[in-house]
């Protein structure tokens, strides 16, 4: 019996805030980084680093790099700043996922790994909250 060619998977870690988007692709263990890019590598203005356009360009660059290394599919882990900060991902997250799929990569699972505090440090605004 002939051996079936092994389907190679990786994990795409997408960190998306309202200031930047960072995409890092690692092997399944997370030990080896295969490709890495951030908003500042594809756009000139700081204010555009978190934009969906920048995320699309980043995802295309990353997809090219990992396809060259023989990766055919990715599991996606989306992360927002979390903790005492914003718990919803920025505008670049969805564009990055869509762009990875459009680049011809198989999408496995998509999970949200935003850190959630279990009563950690005091939230900004102090004891009485933000008074407007």
Swiss-Prot record:
<dbReference type="GO" id="GO:0006412">
    <property type="term" value="P:translation"/>
</dbReference>
<keyword id="KW-0689">Ribosomal protein</keyword>
<protein>
    <recommendedName>
        <fullName>Small ribosomal subunit protein uS11</fullName>
    </recommendedName>
</protein>
<dbReference type="GO" id="GO:0005840">
    <property type="term" value="C:ribosome"/>
</dbReference>
<keyword id="KW-0699">rRNA-binding</keyword>
<dbReference type="InterPro" id="IPR036967">
    <property type="entry name" value="Ribosomal_uS11_sf"/>
</dbReference>
<comment type="similarity">
    <text>Belongs to the universal ribosomal protein uS11 family.</text>
</comment>
<comment type="function">
    <text>Located on the platform of the 30S subunit.</text>
</comment>
<dbReference type="InterPro" id="IPR019961">
    <property type="entry name" value="Ribosomal_uS11_archaeal"/>
</dbReference>
<dbReference type="GO" id="GO:0019843">
    <property type="term" value="F:rRNA binding"/>
</dbReference>
<dbReference type="InterPro" id="IPR018102">
    <property type="entry name" value="Ribosomal_uS11_CS"/>
</dbReference>
<keyword id="KW-0687">Ribonucleoprotein</keyword>
<dbReference type="Pfam" id="PF00411">
    <property type="entry name" value="Ribosomal_S11"/>
</dbReference>
<comment type="subunit">
    <text>Part of the 30S ribosomal subunit.</text>
</comment>
<dbReference type="InterPro" id="IPR001971">
    <property type="entry name" value="Ribosomal_uS11"/>
</dbReference>
<feature type="region of interest" description="Disordered">
    <location>
        <begin position="113"/>
        <end position="132"/>
    </location>
</feature>
<keyword id="KW-0694">RNA-binding</keyword>
<dbReference type="GO" id="GO:0003735">
    <property type="term" value="F:structural constituent of ribosome"/>
</dbReference>
<dbReference type="GO" id="GO:1990904">
    <property type="term" value="C:ribonucleoprotein complex"/>
</dbReference>
């Amino acid at each position: 019996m002939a051996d079936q060619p092994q389907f190679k998977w990786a994990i795409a870690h997408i960190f998306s805030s309202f200031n930047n988007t960072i995409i890092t692709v690692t092997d399944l263990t997370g030990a080896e980084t295969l490709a890495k890019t951030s908003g500042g590598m594809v756009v000139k203005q700081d204010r555009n680093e978190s934009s969906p356009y920048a995320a699309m360009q980043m995802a295309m660059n990353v997809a090219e790099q990992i396809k060259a290394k023989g990766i055919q599919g990715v599991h996606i882990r989306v992360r927002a700043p979390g903790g005492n900060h914003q718990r919803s991902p920025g505008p670049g997250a969805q564009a990055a996922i869509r762009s990875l799929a459009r680049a011809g990569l198989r999408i496995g699972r998509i999970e949200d790994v935003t850190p959630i505090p279990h009563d950690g440090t005091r939230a900004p605004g102090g004891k009485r909250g933000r008074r407007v």
